[in-house]
Amino acid sequence: MSAIQGIEGVISQLQATAMSARAQESLPQPTISFAGQLHAALDRISDTQTAARTQAEKFTLGEPGVALNDVMTDMQKASVSMQMGIQVRNKLVAAYQEVMSMQV
């Protein structure tokens, strides 16, 4: 008898999980545009470069609490993010050119 009750308990848990999954599927998901994502990525790259530049200026002025290794790390992060942005742009341009060269 207890085995049947255990199986019924598992079945009821599965049904509850299925019901909650259906409820989550019915909620409208926010749409994120490609242009919006690209703009946000460019903003993050710009913010990284601005932070690195600010950190370097503070170090140059001799402000306390700004270490050289932090400045170098921030500058390297800014450089890497810029290179990543350039590579993404190159891939987008190549994809655009490929689409434009397709015959309809």
Curated annotation (Swiss-Prot):
**InterPro entries, per the entry:** FliE
GO MF: cytoskeletal motor activity; structural molecule activity
Keyword Lipoprotein applies: no
Q: Does the keyword ATP-binding apply?
A: no
Where can this protein be found? Bacterial flagellum basal body
Q: Which GO terms describe its cellular component?
A: bacterial-type flagellum; bacterial-type flagellum basal body; bacterial-type flagellum basal body, rod
For this UniProt record, the keywords arranged alphabetically read as follows: Bacterial flagellum
Record-level GO BP terms = bacterial-type flagellum assembly; bacterial-type flagellum-dependent cell motility; chemotaxis
HAMAP family for the chain: FliE
Spell out the NCBIfam families in the cross-references. Answer: fliE
The UniProt entry's sequence similarity note says:
Belongs to the FliE family.
- In Swiss-Prot or TrEMBL terms, this protein is called Flagellar hook-basal body complex protein FliE
What taxonomic classification does the UniProt entry list for its organism? Answer: Bacteria, Pseudomonadati, Pseudomonadota, Gammaproteobacteria, Enterobacterales
Gene behind the chain: fliE
